[in-house]
From Swiss-Prot:
Chemical reaction(s) catalysed: Exonucleolytic cleavage in the 3'- to 5'-direction to yield nucleoside 5'-phosphates
Protein name as catalogued: Exoribonuclease 2
HAMAP family hit by this protein: RNase_II
Organism name: Pasteurella multocida (strain Pm70)
Domain S1 motif: 576-658
SMART domains: CSP, RNB
Domain RNB: 189-531
Pfam families: OB_RNB (PF08206), RNB (PF00773), S1 (PF00575)
Amino acid sequence: MFQNNPLLSQLKQQIRDSKQQVEGIVKGSDKAFGFLECDKKSYFIPPAAMKKVMHGDKIKALIEVVGEKEQAEPDALIEPMLTRFIARVRFNKDKKLQVLVDHPQINQAIGAAQDKSITETLQEGDWVVATLKTHPLRDDRFFFAQIQQFICRAEDELAPWWVTLARHGQSRYPVQGCADYPMIDQHTREDLTALHFITIDAETTLDMDDALYLEPIHQAEEQIGWRLVVAVADPTAYIPLDSQIEQEARQRCFTNYLPGFNIPMLPPELSDERCSLMQDEIRPALVCYIETDLTGNITEKPRFVSAYVQSKAKLAYDHVSDYLENCLDAWQPENPQIAQQIQWLHQFTQARIEWRKQHALLFKEKPDYSFILAENGSVQAIQAQYRRIANQMVEECMILANICAAHYLDEHAKCGIFNTHSGFDKKYLESAHQFLLNQLSDETNQAVLATRYSVANLTTLAGYCQMRHDIELLNSDYLELRLRRFLTFAEFKSEIAPHFGLGLSGYATWTSPIRKYSDMVNHRLIKAVLTQQTCEKPQDDLFVRLQEARRQNRLVERDIADWLYCRYLATQVEQKPTFQAEIQDVMRGGLRVQLLANGAPMFIPASLIHDNKEAIQVNTDTLTLSIQGEVKYKLGDIIQVQLLDVKEETRSIVGTLC
């Protein structure tokens, strides 16, 4: 009687139209209910309604009043949380195939089917890639997924690597090589094999793409400067533009440096052998001559040439640093020529560091954390590694070479792949201005600093560098970390632009063509200038891919590290060890910190900071946490923490204050 009744349908529509409609993101909980997070309000989603949605779904909902409380009734799906996702295989009590999503806030099992292309027999706990096929709000059916790819078995010790690479759509395999690599670049090359080039890398490095030679410049028997010769491996001499290797390199963009092993951008026989600037081997190279005065100022325009070079020594960072620091039983150079190059490079580096300190910006010294792994992938130890003098020697030479390349490309090619950074994000400029005044000004200097840190001044390279130099004098990690939140992201651009992070007017990398596709592109442009050929501007889609690949690689490295940290610290939970930690973030839910001994991330819940949550106030502008009105914790503070719990399934490490 009521079926297909137009009056009833009209009444239902009127009732529906009379209800408030909202859009928001579903937030799950550890209970059956959830919440709909809207711009300015949060609505309760009852358990029955939560069965239609998943944490992270963007939906439209109707707001109903039940008793005296508002609650959300999911109405339409705008954007699902899941499309392609990582999961673990599960079989229910009826032996039906299901998947458990690898996400800390999604715990419901989803029915699944196996794609015919998968040849492995799936077992409980296996890691897989799946896609969501049906969604209750979109398809009027229950959640259902299709397993598209087998990743690895549950017990595979290398799961952190294989799962993370699959999550971000990256290959675990190197690029397929060729049977032979004839040199396609037949242009004339200078013979520079007599110069005493040296390489300085990690002891285990095979893909050596830069070698250095330095000599003093004399006038009337007095030294007036330095002549640095930077030789860079030339893979484009072997790789045709239309080759499969070129296309693979363009897609990968970077060598992926992971804990324990690397996934090279180029075939290993190119990156580790044919192109690598190995000791005593003659190699084609792109070479740059750079002249400076004794204070590090560039005095002549750089000169690029194609050449053949021969590295005379493969040196290791730690050996060279030990030698220069006069460590006990330190390594010694094999001959006077190597010793001379090391000493000259050391002197040159001191001048360049001082030049950058005055005219640009220096990096804040922070350690890198290195995982020491057993053959099966288990973590044996984690070491904090600081940049020593030998690292700085190579770094200063590379930075100088990249400065020269930027201005050379700008002048001669009128294009390139430039590394740029525009400082503060435009939408945060006013906030950065106010923060600086609030933190640094008083009655005596307010007028001066209002001009010094004006929005207009902070948008200029000179004004930004001036501000950073002011901050460095205060030696405040808090100011450094808080201001970092106002910065925009670094970008690749086809035209020269400042790099505020480095404090430079132009920067274009070309010194790592074995490891970076952008450097290969810049090589081709420089070589086009040298051979008087047309310089073709890189296409826009390449810049999009470079940005995405850089972001993906950082996420892959972070996700693997988080997993390994959990495995490493899980064995120590019972001992409840204590650590020094630096506060990295301040949130209403608690503090995020980094353990200084090993770099592990840890979360300190607010409930463990103070037993009365009403006594805790978090200022989201200054990123400080106060207890009963008094600021107790802020970004950059060093605090003592204790390990409480590790949950490998969610890659979370929880601690408390000591």
